[in-house]
Regions:
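Short acidic-glycine-tyrosine-enriched beta hairpin
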Residues: 64-80
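A short, N-terminal "cap"/entry segment at the start of jelly-roll beta-barrel domains
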Residues: 1-28, 39-40, 108-111
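Glycine-centered loop/turn positions within well-structured domains
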Residues: 38, 47, 76, 84, ...
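Ligand-binding loop in jelly-roll beta-barrel domains
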Residues: 80-106
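Short, conserved beta-strand element in jelly-roll/cupin
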Residues: 32-33, 44-59, 101
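Short histidine-centered beta-strand/loop micro-motifs
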Residues: 17-20, 30, 38-44, 61, ...
Length: 111
């Protein structure tokens, strides 16, 4: 698949806000319902660091296969090139920050 610079049109979330956006680094806040997810994808250049504010997240990762559950206050980083899927593992909305950098942002969706 081809890398995309803006992935906001590819999947629905309850809310998306950017708190910091500068060359090579950004901080986004996302809120997803229990039925929403961020589909399988990877980034060529940036690491994703997730920080849960409310609710709970479940991350599925490949290479190697791994499953991570995060509660409020917990973090997890996904290295560039590692495929991952982000889901809400709770019964209410989940809100989290994702710190993305250092490098040029891209999003490579998988089918």
């Amino acid at each position: 698949m081809e890398a995309i610079k803006d992935s906001s049109h590819l999947y629905e979330v309850e809310r998306r806000a950017y708190h910091v956006e500068r060359p090579g680094f950004r901080i986004a806040e996302l809120q997803i319902s229990p039925t929403q997810n961020v589909p399988w994808h990877y980034h060529n250049n940036v690491q994703d660091t997730f920080y849960v504010l409310e609710g709970s997240l479940r991350l599925f990762l490949r290479d190697p296969k791994e499953e991570v559950r995060l509660a409020p206050g917990q973090t997890y980083s996904v290295r560039p090139g590692r495929t991952h899927l982000v889901t809400n593992s709770g019964q209410t909305s989940a809100t989290y920050l994702v710190l993305q950098g250092i490098g040029e942002y891209d999003y490579v969706p998988l089918t």
